[in-house]
Amino acid sequence: MKISAAVLTVVLMAASLCAPASASPNGSDTIPCCFAYLSAVLPRAHVKEYFYTSSKCSNFAVVFVTRRNRQVCANPKKKWVQEYINYLELK
């Protein structure tokens, strides 16, 4: 039973790092909106730039763009997100 609980935990953690935290266009509009935040800290070396979601989106978020051009949503209230923004601004 402990093994299946551990496997389930790993699967759920992996799933939380996937698509729900990605920025997606809102309908036919090309403005990305976020519906969930990344639950883990993104390695800073992977981040090349960032932008904020539009006020038209229901959730305010920071969208980090990775070196592979993947857009990842992050909670702007998290300390690590604010530190990454400061780092990118000073870069």
UniProtKB/Swiss-Prot annotation:
Gene3D superfamilies found in the cross-reference section: 2.40.50.40
Disulfide bonds: 33-57, 34-73
GO BP annotation list: antimicrobial humoral immune response mediated by antimicrobial peptide; chemokine-mediated signaling pathway; eosinophil chemotaxis; G protein-coupled receptor signaling pathway; inflammatory response; positive regulation of cell migration; regulation of insulin secretion
The keyword NAD appears for this protein: no
Superkingdom as given in the UniProt entry: Eukaryota
GO MF, any single term: CCR chemokine receptor binding
PROSITE patterns, sorted: SMALL_CYTOKINES_CC
GO CC annotation, single: extracellular space
Subcellular location per the Swiss-Prot or TrEMBL entry: Secreted
InterPro entries on file: Chemokine_b/g/d (IPR039809), Chemokine_CC_CS (IPR000827), Chemokine_IL8-like_dom (IPR001811), Interleukin_8-like_sf (IPR036048)
SUPFAM superfamilies for this protein: Interleukin 8-like chemokines
Signal peptide: 1-23
Chief place of localization: secreted
Keywords attached to this entry: Chemotaxis, Cytokine, Disulfide bond, Inflammatory response, Secreted, Signal
Role of this protein: Chemoattractant for blood monocytes, memory T-helper cells and eosinophils. Causes the release of histamine from basophils and activates eosinophils. May activate several chemokine receptors including CCR1, CCR3, CCR4 and CCR5. May also be an agonist of the G protein-coupled receptor GPR75. Together with GPR75, may play a role in neuron survival through activation of a downstream signaling pathway involving the PI3, Akt and MAP kinases. By activating GPR75 may also play a role in insulin secretion by islet cells.
Family: Belongs to the intercrine beta (chemokine CC) family.
Protein name: C-C motif chemokine 5
Organism lineage string: Eukaryota, Metazoa, Chordata, Craniata, Vertebrata
